[in-house]
Design a protein with these regions (language model features):
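Short linear sequence elements within intrinsically disordered, low-complexity coil regions
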Residues: 21-25, 58, 89-91, 182, ...
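Long, highly charged low-complexity segments enriched in Glu/Asp and Lys/Arg with interspersed Ser/Thr
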Residues: 145-152
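Generic intrinsically disordered, low-complexity segments enriched for polar/acidic and small residues
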Residues: 13-17, 41, 79, 429
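Cationic-aromatic interfacial patches
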Residues: 32-139
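Bacterial Sec-dependent N-terminal signal peptides
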Residues: 1-33
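Well-ordered beta-sheet/strand-loop patches within structured domains
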Residues: 31-35, 45, 110, 117, ...
């Protein structure tokens, strides 16, 4: 056994090592928990490999304090401050370091950079969009440009005023966003937790959609069953839509309208064919003529359905697809707006105009019926839509496709809180139960 003096010395050494390891671990843990480590490294390089937040020998507390204060008040715009390392910011904002503390300074510099980048991205692009959107071909196209924009502007910040000005500039300035933001801040004490969730979700959708600053774009809000057509941040057209039933939900996605088809065929989806039309036509094959439909074989030939033995067909064996001929009694009406998503969902006219008179417009199999398709088409294709041609309701007209020279972004979202055209914040029922 070691002498008492040696045992005490060994214990002191062990305690020192433990505390030293805890100190190092605590500092390095922050680096390991960075939300955007690669972007932090990019910002460091853009800053000339300097300690952006902790420059040696300089009193830079004002810059750090400005970031901490913005993060601290992030609840007012529906964000959660602890996501942005708020506790670490609060503990270290007042610290200054000497050359001997360079390791700690570098670690904290990364932490502050990560907090700033995460805050910028969330204010600029919205939070949690990927959890709502099933398909998004727009965000990934602009992700690199978004990151470059944020980092290049952060890298040239020289003062607290510069930082605050830049962070404020990242928020949308359109009145819809501002109304929702003010509702959340002004009524925070009286709002239920569910209403706060509605407002916060809506703010994030607005941030996401508006930050692209597209020249032309369309928003379909499934929750309100409405469509808005924008030019930059200005709403040019608003109309009702009919969207999917709760059992056949319209998916949320971001794609492009690439083509408008005048007098489209309706190629009936297989699910509708097998579950609805096949049983109906087996009972009464004459309904095919009444509904102006055709059977098409694998080679694209129209089949004479009067000569078929309908008894042999069932869900497991039906070698045809069903197509509805063109005309005003076509389920797609006289205009179809093709979208680039792989989800099989598109915008279209309808032969059932009465559905738009209802306050409850969740009737479709998933596609989106548009109240005023000719108006929308005229905005997308100025001077190319002949209203008389469409309103003539021609029978069996060959479909006439028109490609858009520049495809128009289409966002299909789910905002249960929305600012309407009268500048009133409206709360909608969570018809699909997505917020529960």
């Amino acid at each position: 056994m070691l002498p008492l003096k040696n045992r005490r010395l060994r214990s002191s050494i062990i305690i020192f090592i433990v505390f030293f390891c805890l100190e190092i671990t605590g500092n390095s843990a922050s680096a390991q928990n960075l939300l955007h480590p690669s972007l932090v490294n990019r910002l460091y390089k853009l800053s000339g490999n300097k300690l952006f937040w902790f420059p040696p020998g300089e009193q830079s507390q004002a810059l750090r304090l400005a970031l901490k204060n913005k993060v601290d008040s992030s609840i007012n715009i529906g964000l959660k401050k602890y996501k942005y390392h708020y506790n670490e910011l609060d503990r270290n904002t007042a610290k200054n370091f000497t050359e001997e503390d360079s390791v700690k300074a570098r670690q904290l510099n990364k932490l502050f950079s990560d907090a700033a980048i995460a805050y910028c991205k969330d204010v600029y692009q919205g939070v949690g969009i990927d959890s709502w959107i099933k398909y998004d071909e727009i965000s990934r196209k602009y992700e690199d440009a978004d990151n470059t924009y944020l980092l290049s502007h952060l890298a040239v910040v020289k003062s607290a005023n510069d930082l605050v000005h830049f962070l404020n500039s990242l928020e949308p300035v359109d009145k819809e966003y501002l109304l929702i933001k003010n509702e959340l801040h002004r009524r925070s004490d009286s709002l239920s937790s569910f209403q706060k969730q509605q407002l916060t979700t809506s703010l994030n959708f607005y941030r996401w959609m508006h930050h692209f600053n597209f020249e032309k774009w369309i928003v379909v809000n499934v929750a309100s069953a409405t469509l808005r057509y924008y030019e930059y941040d200005s709403v040019k057209l608003t109309m009702k839509v009919v969207v999917g039933k709760p059992s056949t939900k319209t998916p949320r996605f971001a794609a492009h309208c690439s083509q408008v088809i005048l007098y489209p065929y309706w190629n009936v989806p297989a699910s509708i064919t097998l579950n609805e039309l096949l049983p109906q036509f087996k009972r009464n094959p004459g309904d095919i003529d009444i509904l102006n439909m055709q059977l098409i074989d694998a080679n694209g030939n129209i089949i004479n359905h009067h000569k078929l033995n309908w008894k042999i067909y069932n869900k497991s064996y039906f070698p045809y697809r069903i197509r509805q001929s063109t005309g005003c009694d076509n389920s797609l009406g006289v205009i179809k707006f093709n979208l680039t998503s792989p989800l099989g969902v598109y915008l279209h006219d309808t032969d059932n105009k009465a559905a738009f008179r209802s306050g409850y417009r969740y009737y479709s199999h998933g596609c989106i019926r548009v109240e005023e398709p000719i108006k929308l088409a005229n905005y997308l294709l100025p001077n190319l839509i002949d209203s008389n041609f469409l309103e003539s309701c021609l029978k069996d007209q060959v479909p006439f496709p028109i490609n858009l020279i520049k495809p128009v972004p289409v966002f299909v979202v789910y905002q249960t809180a929305e600012a309407d055209v009268k500048n009133v914040v409206k709360y909608y029922k969570d018809v699909y139960g997505l917020l529960r």
